[in-house]
Amino acid sequence: MQVSEHIRRAFQAERCGQMRRALSELYLALEETARREYGDAGDQKGQDNTARLITEHLQTILSLWPNMPIAKNLKIPCPAPELEEQADADGYCFLDIVLLWLMKRAAEEKELPVQWHTEPVLGVWDGALHLSTGLTWALMLLIVTRKANRNEHLEELEVAGISVTAMINELWGNERKLKKMFPEAVWEPELTANTRQ
C-alpha cells in the first residue's frame, strides 16, 4: 500500500476520533518511509529503521506537535510494565521509545493505555499515558515531507468540507516548504541513539 493511502486513512481516522487506527496507519507509513530512506537493513546498533527514523527526528516531531517541549533525550514516566527494562533507575523512558511502542501496539490492534486530549498534554498519571491529538499531525507532516516520499500523491482529502489535497500534495518530499511554514521548528536530525549513556 502507498504511503499516501496510509496518510489518508490516518487523517480520516483522526478526524473521527479513532486514534488507535490513526496511529496504526501512521506506523505503517513510517515503516515504509524508513525502508525507503534507509534500506532494508537496520542501523549499526541493531535498531530497526522505523525506530531510527523516530529517534533521529524526535525534535522535529516535538516542534511540529503544538506546544510541546523540545528537548534532546526527553523522558517521561514509563507508561507500561513491558517498557520497564528500557526505563532508567527512576522509572523514566525516552519519549521516542514510548512513541514507537505505542504505534506498534496500535498496529497490532492492542489496547492503548492512552487518554487523548485536544489541548497540549504529555505525561503519565492515573495509570494512563496522556497525549494531545496534535501528535498525529506532527507525525503526518514528518512522513509527508520526507524526501523518500516525494513521488506520493493524494487523490482527495477534505477537512470540514474543504479540500486540503493540493496543500498536502505540495508537501510530499518537500521539507523545505514545511520549513517555511514552521520556521521555529527543529529540522536537523539528531543522532540521539548514538549519544545516550
List PLM regions with ranges.
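Histidine-centered, metal-coordinating catalytic motifs and their short helical/loop contexts
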Residues: 75-120
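Amphipathic, Lys/Arg-enriched alpha-helical patches that create a basic surface
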Residues: 97, 112-183
